[in-house]
Amino acid sequence: MTVLAIDPGSEQSAWVLYDGQRVLGHGIIPNDMMLAHARVNYYLPVVIEEIASYGMAVGREVFQTVRWAAKFEQAVLEQRRITGVGAVYYLPRRDVKLHLCQSARAKDANVRQALLDRFGGEKAAKGNKAAPGPLHGLGKDEWQ
């Protein structure tokens, strides 16, 4: 099953298109482009990272990010009303950390390493330009 995963941000968002075995596409793009991307890919399950503060104070940037996540969700659901297909799921980062690292305290580097390990280590997972691995080209927020 192919899934569109979105890590929303206040101005730009990371996205990964994953088919269960390899990354089919990825990028970090301005939010207005991500909104269009969500509308076009509405027929896929869309998984959006759920924002959580865990009791910490949050600022304007976090609220902007939450608004954009809701806009992405709305874009998919509007298309679903028209076509009858499409689904949106929110996934808290904490759940990802627990699943991949068995610890809610895992850091970004731990999550990245767990993903590399799952695909045979860094060399096999990333590959190279001539022989790309299933995670070839991922960077920054695309790992999360």
Where are these regions (language model features)?
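Phosphate- and other anionic-substrate recognition elements at nucleic-acid/protein interfaces
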Residues: 1-144
